[in-house]
Amino acid sequence: MERARPEPPPQPRPLRPAPPPLPVEGTSFWAAAMEPPPSSPTLSAAASATLASSCGEAVASGLQPAVRRLLQVKPEQVLLLPQPQAQNEEAAASSAQARLLQFRPDLRLLQPPTASDGATSRPELHPVQPLALHVKAKKQKLGPSLDQSVGPRGAVETGPRASRVVKLEGPGPALGYFRGDEKGKLEAEEVMRDSMQGGAGKSPAAIREGVIKTEEPERLLEDCRLGAEPASNGLVHGSAEVILAPTSGAFGPHQQDLRIPLTLHTVPPGARIQFQGAPPSELIRLTKVPLTPVPTKMQSLLEPSVKIETKDVPLTVLPSDAGIPDTPFSKDRNGHVKRPMNAFMVWARIHRPALAKANPAANNAEISVQLGLEWNKLSEEQKKPYYDEAQKIKEKHREEFPGWVYQPRPGKRKRFPLSVSNVFSGTTQNIISTNPTTVYPYRSPTYSVVIPSLQNPITHPVGETSPAIQLPTPAVQSPSPVTLFQPSVSSAAQVAVQDPSLPVYPALPPQRFTGPSQTDTHQLHSEATHTVKQPTPVSLESANRISSSASTAHARFATSTIQPPREYSSVSPCPRSAPIPQASPIPHPHVYQPPPLGHPATLFGTPPRFSFHHPYFLPGPHYFPSSTCPYSRPPFGYGNFPSSMPECLSYYEDRYPKHEGIFSTLNRDYSFRDYSSECTHSENSRSCENMNGTSYYNSHSHSGEENLNPVPQLDIGTLENVFTAPTSTPSSIQQVNVTDSDEEEEEKVLRDL
């Protein structure tokens, strides 16, 4: 920060070569402080300073008397203004100095050398001891009276932009003015004024210590330069403050022309400053709020709320002297065997009655807390008899219940969703990671499931799978997925899970195979239609029994949702009289490549052609969390969503046959394109191949509508091989072997469902 230098008229002379001084950037400032009112005993001092900007006027001889000024721009500088020129004002100046010394006895009042030789007196700068004190400034409007009250101490900034120039105005050229640094901070350590107007004598006051930060004026009035003479008389008195009685008429006749008054005063710490005008937008006022410490009583959690007396209660009664008979280890009504007592329980059982009798107002919980405190106070030697007794009880308990293992009560355990261990308990699970052989990229994910039901165990390569059923992810989600079961008795297959980002299809394109066509025999037409309104459950059960076949297919579709009622077109059931072809091993799996099926809803009619469709087949949300393990969560839904699958699976433990399925991601918009150029059927024609090599086709006409066809063509051979359920999406193909049990129990459970 540049040091402020006063400029004496008429010729400004700089102290040393310096950057060009800044012009005056402010209008008139006025700072006045009078004596504090007698009602404020805490106010220690008051000060007044009047500053106004005006250049180009000469110093007149009619200056106001008894004006004492000391403006310190920096902590180590004091500006000494010239001596009053009028001889008749010396008496008033001396009286003012005497009054000032009453307030500040530690000050030294020095008179500058008189200009007897006609030389112009120049203000001088003298270093003094820096003081770390602050002065608060408050902006006020100029009223009819110039009296301004002041406070003791404080600190405040009156604006975001501190004024760079403070000027003194007189009847002639300006006596002196100051300029701060380019950052706009004007610091004053000591400002003392004694202003007298006419006959009204204002008592001199002093601002003890302060930092003045003024607001930058809005208009530029004068363009003045700053200059100063170096200190020549060397008035330096250590740490004492230097006060000079200057000319007194600089503020007299022009006080009425002041436009922007500014009162500088001290305020107590933490005081709130309020501006009468519009406060600067960038000003941030911080107020210290005194916090009274409130004593907080920290009550120990181990101490009872009621004072329990233990003076007359014996707390070291031995188990042999207690006279309490040994109670047999009892079971509760559920057959739960209680644990044997430990040492503390043995001790508490003996002393609880006596402690409760001595404190009848205490409840059982408070008695227990006090017993715990008293037990901790005992020494190890005093606790030893109770540990010995607890060991005897434990040995007796082991003899009575040799295979007993402590188990917490089931009612106290937190219930979780059905886990994989509960679903597939007692089954063998072989997880094999492989890579897809052939990938046909699609735009958006759907899910394809391939689960053939075979009489004889057949292991297909990953790329050589049986017909696929694509499971969509519905756009309108509902909290209950549809479950589709296909348990089969004597079949044994493998479940394969495919990477969701890489859908798997046969390595060879789907082809037509020559052979006796059984389309007339196996192509089924619906015999009835059903109009369904949600949330009415839709059930479709196919219980086809063939005496010559050992496999029985059961399919159940349970729809449960809480969506608003919406009417869907017909869903046709499968007639029970439909014949099902006998399954036989494929002689050459790598030669006969069955083409993948379309959407499973196409089993019942026209599949949707758009990504947004009604969830008529799988209305529930598909729970496919991104996980590397396919069964890290329950494979048939997770979370708190209502689903009938976990309950159903609880009946199917150890009853599933081995199935083979591939879970993959396909296109969501379901634009079922021809998988081979050789397919001459419609866009979504599917070829369902018999295990003997006979292929029969199901052709469906697509009208682009979203609803189902009232009279769909259903392939019971495909429905027989369906075993679908949403599962976790893995990062690689997983194989899980699941075993099964007899047929009658499955039929019984499915009939109940």
Swiss-Prot record:
The identity of this protein, by name, is Transcription factor SOX-30
Q: What is the recorded function of this protein according to its Swiss-Prot or TrEMBL entry?
A: Acts both as a transcriptional activator and a repressor. Binds to the DNA sequence 5'-ACAAT-3' and shows a preference for guanine residues surrounding this core motif. Binds to its own promoter and activates its own transcription. Required to activate the expression of postmeiotic genes involved in spermiogenesis. Binds to the promoter region of CTNNB1 and represses its transcription which leads to inhibition of Wnt signaling. Also inhibits Wnt signaling by binding to the CTNNB1 protein, preventing interaction of CTNNB1 with TCF7L2/TCF4.
Originating gene: SOX30
* Assembly, per entry: Interacts with CTNNB1, competitively inhibiting CTNNB1-TCF7L2/TCF4 interaction.
| PANTHER family in alphabetical order | TRANSCRIPTION FACTOR SOX-30
- InterPro entries the UniProt entry points to: HMG_box_dom (IPR009071), HMG_box_dom_sf (IPR036910), SOX30_TF (IPR052856)
User: Per UniProt, which keywords does this protein have?
Assistant: Activator, Cytoplasm, DNA-binding, Nucleus, Repressor, Transcription, Transcription regulation
Could you tell me which SUPFAM superfamilies the record lists for this protein? HMG-box
Query: Which species?
Result: Homo sapiens (Human)
Signal peptide boundaries: none
